[in-house]
A protein has these predicted regions:
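Anion-binding (especially nucleotide phosphate/pyrophosphate-binding) glycine-rich loop
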Residues: 73-139
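Glycine-rich nucleotide/cofactor/substrate-binding loop typically near the N-terminus or early
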Residues: 23-99, 169, 190-199, 205-206
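Glycine-rich phosphate-binding loop
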Residues: 134, 261-269, 277-316
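Glycine/threonine-rich beta-strand-loop-alpha-helix active-site module
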Residues: 110-113, 117-120, 124-133, 138-188
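Carboxylate- and glycine-rich phosphate/diphosphate-binding segment that chelates Mg2+/Mn2+
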Residues: 92, 103, 160, 189-252
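Conserved small/polar residues in nucleotide/adenosyl-binding loops
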Residues: 350-354
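Catalytic phosphate/nucleotide-handling subdomain of diverse soluble enzymes
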Residues: 285, 301-344, 349
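Oxyanion-binding "anion nests"
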Residues: 223-289
Length: 354
C-alpha cells in the first residue's frame, strides 16, 4: 500500500487549498484503489493562509463586522487554530485590494482600520499569539488605521483626531497609546511576510506597491513623505526606527506598525505554515508527496508553498509531484528544490524538471 500526501496551496479564484488537496486525492484513488491518502492544505502567508491553517489543524473560523478600506461595514473572518492559543488574520481580508473596484482604489484615503478590528476580535478571545499574513492590501497608511481601531489616538497639531488614509499622516503630531485596548497587549504578534521592502524610499511601500493600489506619480511622493514623517514620530516616541526594517513596507506599511508598536517578529509565511500544520511529520509518513498551486514557474522557488513542501520532502528523500493550473517558464531550477515532475492541468501538460 502506497501512502500519498496531498499538500497544495490554493488555486487562486478557483479552489481553496483543501479543495485542491481533495481533488488530488480523488485522482489518486481512481488510479490506486489501495492508496492511503492524507490531505494537508498549505499556504505561503498570503491570501488563503487563514483557511489553510484552520483546515490543516482542525481549527475554527470566526466572522465579525469590520470596516473595508473605505469605511463601509462588511463581514470579516479570521481563524483560531486547534490549540486555541493561536489566531490567524490576513490583511487582505478586511483591507484588501479585492474589496474595491478599480475606480475606488485610492491609497491616499484607504485605511487598514478593518484589519485592526480583526486583531482586536481575536485578542478578545484570549489567544496568546496572532499570526498576521501581510499582503494584498489596498492601503498605504503604515498601519495607522489598524492602530486607530485598537484605540491608539493619532492627533494633529491642534489636538484633533487624524482622518484615515496614508495622506493624513503628514499631519500627525502626537501618538497617544494610553487609550489602546488592553486586550491587544496580552498577545504576541508574528508577521508572515515574504517581502523585504522597507517602509520608505525607492523600494518602499509607496514607490513599489502604491501604483497598483491607484497611486499616481504625485501621490507616491505625497505618501512616501507622509510615511517618512510618521516613521520619525514613531522613532522619537518609542525609540524604534521602522523606516528601514526589512518587511516594514509590507501591506502598505502595516509591517511598520506591527514592528514599531508591538515588536512583531517577522517570519517567512511558508515557514510559519509548515510549522503550524505539522508538515514534517506528514512528509515522514508519506511515500509520495503531491503539491501545487495555480501557477508554477521560476517564481515558485521564492517563498512559495510548493517550494516549501518540496524542501521538506527532500530532507526525507521523498519524491514530489507538483500540479499547477498552468506551467510557466524557468521551472528547470525547481529540481534542485526537490520537485521531480510538474503537471500543468490546463493543457494536460507534463514536465519533468532537472
Amino acid at each position: 500500500m502506497t501512502r500519498y500526501l496531498c499538500a497544495p496551496d490554493s488555486f487562486k479564484e478557483s479552489l481553496t487549498a483543501m479543495q485542491a488537496a481533495e481533488a488530488m486525492a480523488r485522482g489518486i484513488e481512481n488510479a490506486d484503489r489501495d492508496a492511503e491518502i492524507r490531505c494537508l492544505p498549505m499556504a505561503d502567508g498570503g491570501e488563503g493562509t487563514v483557511r489553510a491553517l484552520v483546515d490543516a489543524t482542525g481549527g475554527t473560523m470566526h466572522a465579525v463586522p469590520v470596516h473595508d478600506p473605505l469605511g463601509r461595514l462588511i463581514e470579516g473572518r479570521f481563524g483560531v487554530l486547534a490549540d486555541g492559543a493561536t489566531a490567524v488574520v490576513e490583511t487582505a481580508e478586511a483591507s484588501g485590494l479585492a474589496r474595491l473596484n478599480a475606480e475606488e482604489r485610492n491609497p491616499l484615503i484607504a485605511s487598514s482600520y478593518g484589519t485592526g478590528e480583526l486583531l482586536l476580535a481575536a485578542a478578545r478571545l484570549g489567544v496568546r499569539r496572532i499570526i498576521v499574513g501581510l499582503g494584498g492590501s489596498a492601503t498605504n497608511d503604515a498601519g495607522a488605521g489598524l492602530l486607530q481601531s485598537l484605540g491608539v489616538r493619532l492627533l494633529d497639531a491642534n489636538g484633533d483626531e487624524l482622518g484615515r488614509g496614508g495622506a493624513a499622516l503628514a499631519d500627525v503630531s502626537v501618538i497617544d497609546i494610553t487609550t489602546m485596548d488592553p486586550a491587544i497587549g496580552n498577545v504576541s504578534i508574528i508577521a508572515a511576510c515574504d517581502v523585504t521592502n522597507p517602509l520608505t524610499g525607492p523600494t518602499g511601500a509607496s514607490a513599489v506597491f502604491g501604483p497598483q493600489k491607484g497611486a499616481g506619480a504625485d501621490d507616491v511622493v505625497t505618501l512616501d513623505a507622509a510615511l517618512a514623517h510618521f516613521a520619525r514620530l514613531i522613532e522619537s516616541r518609542f525609540g524604534v526606527d521602522v523606516s528601514d526594517v526589512p518587511g516594514a513596507g509590507a501591506a502598505g506599511g502595516i509591517g511598520a506598525a506591527l514592528k514599531g508598536f508591538f515588536g512583531a517578529e517577522f517570519r517567512s509565511g511558508v515557514d510559519i505554515v509548515i510549522e503550524q500544520s505539522g508538515l514534517d511529520e506528514a512528509v515522514r509518513w508519506a511515500d509520495v508527496v503531491f503539491t501545487g498551486e495555480g501557477a508554477i514557474d521560476a517564481q515558485t522557488g521564492f517563498g512559495k508553498a510548493p517550494a516549501g513542501v518540496a524542501g521538506a520532502a527532500k530532507r526525507y528523500g521523498k519524491p514530489v509531484v507538483a500540479v499547477a493550473g498552468c506551467v510557466g517558464v524557468g521551472i528547470d531550477g525547481l529540481h534542485g528544490l526537490g520537485i521531480d515532475a510538474v503537471f500543468g492541468i490546463a493543457r494536460s501538460e507534463e514536465r519533468r524538471v532537472g
